[in-house]
Protein backbone atom coordinates (compact mmCIF):
# COMPACT_ATOMS: atom_id res chain seq x y z
CA UNK A 1 0.00 0.00 0.00
CA UNK A 2 1.39 3.39 -0.96
CA UNK A 3 0.66 5.64 2.00
CA UNK A 4 0.78 9.40 2.19
CA UNK A 5 2.87 10.38 5.22
CA UNK A 6 0.83 12.52 7.58
CA UNK A 7 0.94 13.44 11.25
CA UNK A 8 -2.39 14.20 12.92
CA UNK A 9 -3.29 15.71 16.26
CA UNK A 10 -5.30 13.16 18.24
CA UNK A 11 -5.03 14.92 21.58
CA UNK A 12 -8.35 14.48 23.43
CA UNK A 13 -9.94 12.90 20.34
CA UNK A 14 -11.93 9.67 20.72
CA UNK A 15 -10.00 6.77 19.27
CA UNK A 16 -11.71 3.37 19.39
CA UNK A 17 -9.93 0.06 19.74
CA UNK A 18 -12.05 -3.03 19.25
CA UNK A 19 -10.29 -5.91 20.97
CA UNK A 20 -8.86 -6.38 24.42
CA UNK A 21 -5.72 -8.49 24.09
CA UNK A 22 -1.98 -7.89 23.75
CA UNK A 23 -2.16 -6.26 20.32
CA UNK A 24 -4.91 -3.93 21.53
CA UNK A 25 -2.78 -3.11 24.58
CA UNK A 26 0.13 -1.99 22.37
CA UNK A 27 -2.23 0.27 20.40
CA UNK A 28 -3.71 1.68 23.64
CA UNK A 29 -0.21 2.54 24.88
CA UNK A 30 0.74 4.17 21.58
CA UNK A 31 -2.39 6.31 21.36
CA UNK A 32 -2.19 7.36 25.02
CA UNK A 33 1.37 8.62 24.46
CA UNK A 34 -0.09 11.13 22.00
CA UNK A 35 -2.92 12.25 24.29
CA UNK A 36 -5.81 10.42 22.63
CA UNK A 37 -9.02 9.70 24.49
CA UNK A 38 -8.85 5.94 24.00
CA UNK A 39 -11.94 3.76 24.26
CA UNK A 40 -11.84 -0.04 24.17
CA UNK A 41 -14.72 -2.39 23.41
CA UNK A 42 -14.11 -6.14 23.56
CA UNK A 43 -15.65 -9.37 24.74
CA UNK A 44 -12.76 -9.64 27.20
CA UNK A 45 -10.36 -6.88 28.19
CA UNK A 46 -6.95 -7.76 29.59
CA UNK A 47 -5.97 -6.51 33.03
CA UNK A 48 -3.21 -4.25 31.67
CA UNK A 49 -5.72 -2.32 29.55
CA UNK A 50 -8.05 -2.04 32.55
CA UNK A 51 -5.19 -0.51 34.56
CA UNK A 52 -4.58 2.15 31.91
CA UNK A 53 -8.14 3.22 31.12
CA UNK A 54 -10.92 4.41 33.42
CA UNK A 55 -14.01 2.22 33.39
CA UNK A 56 -15.93 4.86 31.42
CA UNK A 57 -13.51 4.31 28.53
CA UNK A 58 -13.78 0.53 28.32
CA UNK A 59 -16.72 -1.78 27.85
CA UNK A 60 -17.11 -5.51 27.58
CA UNK A 61 -19.43 -6.60 24.81
CA UNK A 62 -19.82 -6.09 21.10
CA UNK A 63 -18.95 -2.92 19.21
CA UNK A 64 -21.89 -0.90 17.92
CA UNK A 65 -22.26 1.39 14.94
CA UNK A 66 -22.62 4.28 17.40
CA UNK A 67 -19.24 3.40 18.95
CA UNK A 68 -17.67 3.67 15.51
CA UNK A 69 -19.54 6.78 14.40
CA UNK A 70 -18.38 8.74 17.46
CA UNK A 71 -14.70 7.97 16.83
CA UNK A 72 -12.10 9.86 14.80
CA UNK A 73 -10.24 6.64 14.09
CA UNK A 74 -10.77 2.95 14.76
CA UNK A 75 -8.46 -0.01 15.25
CA UNK A 76 -9.88 -3.49 14.66
CA UNK A 77 -7.75 -5.73 16.88
CA UNK A 78 -9.95 -8.72 17.64
CA UNK A 79 -9.04 -12.36 17.13
CA UNK A 80 -12.01 -12.73 14.75
CA UNK A 81 -11.30 -12.10 11.08
CA UNK A 82 -15.05 -11.72 10.45
CA UNK A 83 -15.44 -9.10 13.18
CA UNK A 84 -12.41 -7.14 11.98
CA UNK A 85 -13.77 -7.21 8.42
CA UNK A 86 -17.20 -5.97 9.56
CA UNK A 87 -15.57 -3.12 11.50
CA UNK A 88 -13.53 -2.17 8.43
CA UNK A 89 -16.65 -2.10 6.25
CA UNK A 90 -18.50 0.11 8.74
CA UNK A 91 -15.55 2.51 8.88
CA UNK A 92 -15.10 2.58 5.11
CA UNK A 93 -18.77 3.43 4.56
CA UNK A 94 -18.47 6.34 7.02
CA UNK A 95 -15.05 7.60 5.91
CA UNK A 96 -13.59 6.87 9.34
CA UNK A 97 -9.90 5.92 9.25
CA UNK A 98 -9.43 2.27 10.23
CA UNK A 99 -6.47 0.03 10.96
CA UNK A 100 -7.19 -3.70 10.75
CA UNK A 101 -4.45 -5.66 12.47
CA UNK A 102 -4.83 -8.83 10.41
CA UNK A 103 -5.68 -7.37 6.98
CA UNK A 104 -3.41 -4.61 5.65
CA UNK A 105 -5.49 -4.43 2.48
CA UNK A 106 -8.45 -3.18 4.55
CA UNK A 107 -6.48 -0.49 6.38
CA UNK A 108 -6.90 3.16 5.51
CA UNK A 109 -3.95 4.04 7.74
CA UNK A 110 -0.98 2.27 9.29
CA UNK A 111 1.17 2.76 12.34
CA UNK A 112 4.70 3.55 11.17
CA UNK A 113 7.78 2.85 13.20
CA UNK A 114 8.47 6.09 15.06
CA UNK A 115 11.76 7.62 16.07
CA UNK A 116 11.32 10.46 18.56
CA UNK A 117 14.03 12.82 19.77
CA UNK A 118 12.58 15.69 21.77
CA UNK A 119 10.12 17.55 19.56
CA UNK A 120 11.31 15.76 16.41
CA UNK A 121 9.27 12.75 15.25
CA UNK A 122 10.15 10.60 12.28
CA UNK A 123 7.65 8.03 10.99
CA UNK A 124 9.09 5.16 8.95
CA UNK A 125 7.09 2.87 6.67
CA UNK A 126 8.81 0.11 4.73
CA UNK A 127 5.62 -1.21 3.19
CA UNK A 128 6.13 -4.43 5.12
CA UNK A 129 9.50 -5.06 3.46
CA UNK A 130 13.06 -4.55 4.63
CA UNK A 131 12.16 -4.22 8.28
CA UNK A 132 15.87 -3.93 9.08
CA UNK A 133 15.75 -0.43 7.55
CA UNK A 134 13.72 0.72 10.54
CA UNK A 135 16.83 0.51 12.70
CA UNK A 136 18.69 3.27 10.84
Region spans (language model):
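Hydrophobic, well-ordered beta-alpha structural blocks that scaffold small-molecule cofactor pockets
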Residues: 1-44, 49
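Glycine-rich, highly charged phosphate/nucleotide-binding loops
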Residues: 54-66
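Short basic, glycine-rich beta-strand/loop surfaces that mediate nucleic-acid
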Residues: 72-79, 109-129
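ADP-ribose/adenylate-binding Rossmann-like module
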Residues: 73-77, 85-109
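Residue-level detector of alpha-helix initiation sites
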Residues: 22-23, 82, 128
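Conserved small/polar residues in nucleotide/adenosyl-binding loops
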Residues: 134-136
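Short loop/edge segments at beta-strand edges and connector loops
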Residues: 42, 59-62, 102
Amino acid sequence: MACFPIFIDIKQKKCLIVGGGKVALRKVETLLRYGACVHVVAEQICEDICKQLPSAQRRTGHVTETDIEKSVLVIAATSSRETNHRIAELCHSRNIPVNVIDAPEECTFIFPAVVQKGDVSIGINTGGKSLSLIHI
